Curated annotation (Swiss-Prot):
Its main location: cytoplasm. InterPro entries: 4-PPantetheinyl_Trfase_dom, 4-PPantetheinyl_Trfase_dom_sf, ACPS, Ppantetheine-prot_Trfase_dom. Its cofactor is Mg(2+). Belongs to the P-Pant transferase superfamily. AcpS family. This is Holo-[acyl-carrier-protein] synthase. One of its GO terms (biological process) is fatty acid biosynthetic process. Transfers the 4'-phosphopantetheine moiety from coenzyme A to a Ser of acyl-carrier-protein. Its EC number is 2.7.8.7. GO terms for cellular component: cytoplasm. It is an enzyme of class 2 (transferase). It catalyses: apo-[ACP] + CoA = holo-[ACP] + adenosine 3',5'-bisphosphate + H(+).
């Protein structure tokens, strides 16, 4: 049974600007070290950062909490499986709230086009 859905769209140019400004504190606050390593190694790193940010926003919308109840940006991490499929790993408070809600699955889809990054999350009981 579907518990919640979340969609977010982000302008990739925002993250290009953050990268040009050398805004390391922002990246360190939002992304895990693994996400920073992954995105920084990519040719279009701003696109990858924007996608991961949109994924985290989408999860928070699907869960229905936003950044309340002690959830941190780093409690969510986007990883790719062996075939490149994106998955959302949950830690600490995000994982705790996920379990408390009786959820069993988190489906994530990412896409980008025309300067925008889009993420959709479906949470299932």
């Amino acid at each position: 049974m579907i518990y919640g859905t979340g969609v977010d769209i982000v302008e990739i140019a925002r993250f290009e600007k953050f990268l040009q400004q050398g805004n390391d504190a922002l990246f360190d606050r939002i992304f895990t070290p693994s996400e920073i390593e992954y995105c920084s190694a990519k040719k279009h790193s701003a696109q990858h950062y924007a996608l991961r940010f949109a994924a985290k926003e989408s999860f928070l919308k699907a869960l229905g909490t936003g950044l309340r109840d002690g959830i941190s940006w780093k409690d969510m991490e986007v990883v790719n499986d062996q075939l490149g499929k994106p998955e959302l790993r949950l830690y600490r408070r995000a994982e705790e709230l996920f379990r408390q809600a009786g959820l069993c699955s988190c489906f994530l889809s990412l896409s980008h086009d025309a300067g925008c990054a889009v993420a959709m999350v479906v949470l299932e009981r």
